[in-house]
């Protein structure tokens, strides 16, 4: 049986891994998942990530904790296969009044809502992270 929403599965693995205080989580890799992991690393929500394997590549995310607490307080899927959510540059949301990020897929790649606003780009809102 094929997976219906691999991005929601990725976010759930991160959420569950941090709830169980795991050091790292692994999942099947894709270009979009690697791009999202790169944004999460740049913004300081995960420690690191790496892709291993050639035939069936696996993405391993090293989770980040601060004083024993998970850095990611909440991670929520927004646009999903059954209901895509697109926003123009002036409609991009601010998550937790700017304390969190919205991961946006634009024509120039996957980036934060802040970076998309500065570049003057809109796109598909993938998820909110705080």
UniProtKB/Swiss-Prot annotation:
Q: How does it assemble?
A: Part of the 30S ribosomal subunit. Contacts proteins S5 and S12.
- Protein name, entry field: Small ribosomal subunit protein uS8
Q: Give GO terms for biological process.
A: translation
| Family designation | Belongs to the universal ribosomal protein uS8 family.
Q: Which domain of life is it from?
A: Bacteria
| HAMAP family xrefs | Ribosomal_uS8_B
User: What Gene Ontology cellular-component terms does the record carry?
Assistant: ribonucleoprotein complex; ribosome
């Amino acid at each position: 049986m094929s997976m219906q929403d691999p991005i929601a599965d990725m976010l759930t693995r991160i959420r569950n891994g941090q709830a169980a205080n795991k050091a790292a989580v692994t999942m099947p890799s894709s270009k979009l998942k690697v791009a999202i992991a790169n944004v999460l690393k740049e913004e300081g929500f995960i420690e690191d990530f790496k892709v291993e394997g050639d035939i069936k590549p696996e993405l391993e995310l090293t989770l980040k904790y601060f004083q024993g607490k998970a850095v990611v307080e909440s991670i929520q899927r927004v646009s999903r296969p059954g209901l895509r959510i697109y926003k123009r540059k002036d409609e991009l949301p601010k998550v937790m009044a700017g304390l969190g990020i919205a991961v946006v897929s634009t024509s120039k790649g996957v980036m934060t809502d802040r970076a998309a606003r500065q570049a003057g780009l809109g796109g598909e809102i993938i998820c909110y992270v705080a």
